[in-house]
Regions:
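Outer-membrane beta-barrel signature, preferentially recognizing the C-terminal barrel domain
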Residues: 150-157, 202, 231-280, 284, ...
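Face-selective signature of the C-terminal outer-membrane beta-barrel domain
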Residues: 2-16, 41-190, 216, 220, ...
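Outer membrane beta-barrel strand-and-loop segments of large Gram-negative receptors
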Residues: 100-104, 146-149, 255, 259, ...
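Surface-exposed extracellular loop regions of Gram-negative outer-membrane beta-barrel proteins
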Residues: 75-77, 129, 141, 184-189, ...
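Conserved C-terminal beta-signal and adjacent last beta-strands/turns
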Residues: 355-478
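Outer-membrane beta-barrel and related beta-rich outer-membrane complex signature
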Residues: 8-27, 66, 77-83, 129-137, ...
Length: 478
């Protein structure tokens, strides 16, 4: 608009059509039950986002005032047929709508050459409307199953404000902040023959302090220390009480009684010459949201999210960036060691699941010429404790090649993910009354091509800060 004021508009969307055929084998040794179930599913997803933002530079150098508003719409419709060649064959139709509105205002004001003040407010509104219906075959045709499906409507409003002050002089940087949040939630469940119709309303206030300290011992050696308290809210789909049927022996559903988890996080880091970093970290979480596995009716596993009483994570992360064995080859290496310790109570028994896990990552970048480049990455996760479950090791290898054309205005990329189809999930579950082993062999390999065209040469548009802060979009798992 002028030399100090910039206004922007963004529009995005994606549309997908997906079909999936799957086979599932279940064996329950104690009661001598075994069977195969075949699932045929089809899903259509339409997502839309619209946003506008304005940034105004104040006359005082370093001062800035910004405001933004974003709207997101997520729509999903799907149908599924589960055939076990027995009378328990089931057909389901599901539909979901999510509307998200987010607005925020932020201000940055330098108090002096060494002191800076930041403040802001944010509000968000979320509305979810999900319906599901199931039918079973009979001599007279398909008839509704009144024990499954219904309608679930969920409304959420979050209002937040924050204040942060920063100090920077010579080799020392200090920042401290405080965020206040108020959350209002209301949900309605239509009920069915197995569950009564119900509703719930929740209101709560919480404070979240943060503090960070950074000190440069010399120009090459930097030390960092930080503390922050965080909130993790349930994904919207995890609150949905509908039951998803894998087969007659495995059901999964949401939990309307889920509440947020709160964590205290401490990190101590050391950086050498901007290319080598090592971090010691510690996190303690109350009411961690994890999947639980329960026996139902002596013949079925019911999977649902629940709050575990405690979760403690400690570990060390080492990262080396931009290593260059030869002129055209750059390597980024990451090694992480994590110790997870979960605790909860089930059927009057105190349960524990704790384990050390190694994680490794390697990213290779090759610049063969000014227009040809390639990437090769590999990631390995070791055996890991995850709530009530133990997850087996997994490996993924990705590769891509890129060509720039037409004076670098056009870029064509050919990529492949999980080249060797090794990133599958294998899980062991043990809890009172339940011992289960899950082996999911989804084919996650992807071969794709991407094309981009830059219409005008100039400075790259920086990603708006607000996009990174819209946490509500990460909670949509319809």
């Amino acid at each position: 608009l002028n030399e100090r004021t910039v206004w922007g508009v963004s529009l995005g969307g994606n549309f997908s059509r997906q079909k999936e055929n799957a086979g599932m084998f279940t064996e329950i040794q104690e009661i001598g039950v075994a069977g195969n179930t075949y699932s045929y599913a089809e899903q259509n997803r339409n997502n839309l986002s619209v946003g506008t933002s304005m940034v105004h530079k104040l006359k005082r150098e370093g001062g800035e005032l910004s405001a933004s508003f974003d709207y997101f719409h997520y729509y999903r419709v799907g149908n599924q047929l589960m055939d076990s060649f027995k009378p328990d064959t089931l057909k389901g139709d599901m539909k979901g709508n999510t509307d998200l509105y987010v607005g925020q205002i932020d201000a940055v004001y330098p108090l002096s050459e060494v002191w800076k003040l930041q403040a802001g407010v944010k509000t968000s509104f979320v509305t979810i409307d999900n319906t599901a219906g199931y039918m079973r075959p009979s001599v007279s045709g398909w008839l509704p199953d009144g024990a499954l499906g219904s309608r679930f409507v969920y409304d959420e409003n979050i209002n937040a404000s924050y204040l942060q002050v920063g100090y920077e002089k010579d080799r020392l940087k200090i920042s401290a902040g405080l965020r206040l949040e108020h959350t209002h939630v209301h949900g309605d469940f239509g009920g069915n023959t197995q569950q009564k119709d119900s509703s719930f309303t929740t209101n709560y206030f919480h404070l979240f302090p943060t503090i960070a300290l950074q000190y440069g011992l010399t120009s090459e050696h930097l030390f960092q220390l930080s503390y922050g308290r965080r909130i993790t809210r349930p994904n919207y789909g995890d609150l949905n009480p509908f039951t998803y049927i894998f087969d007659d022996y495995t059901h999964e559903g949401g939990n309307t009684k889920l509440h947020p988890s709160f964590s205290d996080n401490i990190e101590l880091g050391y950086v050498y010459r901007d290319w080598f970093q090592t971090v010691l970290f510690f996190s303690h979480t109350d009411d961690a949201i994890m999947k639980s596995y329960r026996e139902q009716e002596g013949r079925r596993i019911y999977v649902m999210p629940q709050n575990l009483s405690s979760y403690v994570q400690t570990g060390m992360r080492v990262h080396a960036a931009n290593l260059s064995p030869v002129s055209f080859w750059k390597v980024n290496l990451t090694a992480i060691g994590i110790y997870n310790n979960y605790g909860w109570t089930e059927q009057g028994q105190k349960m524990k699941n704790r384990m050390f896990t190694p994680i490794f990552g390697c990213m290779n970048q090759f610049a063969f010429t000014s227009v040809w480049s390639a990437e090769l990455s590999a990631n390995y996760n070791g055996r890991m404790a995850y709530g009530q479950a133990t997850v087996h090791p997994a490996l993924e290898v990705n590769v891509g090649i890129q060509k720039k054309m037409f004076r670098n205005r056009c870029t064509v990329t050919l990529f492949a993910k999980d080249v060797f189809n090794t990133n599958y999930q294998k899980v062991d579950i043990q809890s009172p009354g339940v011992q289960a082993f899950v082996d999911e062999r989804h084919n996650k390999r992807v071969l794709g091509i991407a094309f981009s065209w830059r219409f005008q040469k100039g400075s790259d548009t920086k990603e708006s800060r607000r996009k990174k802060e819209i946490d509500e979009t990460k909670r949509v798992n319809l």
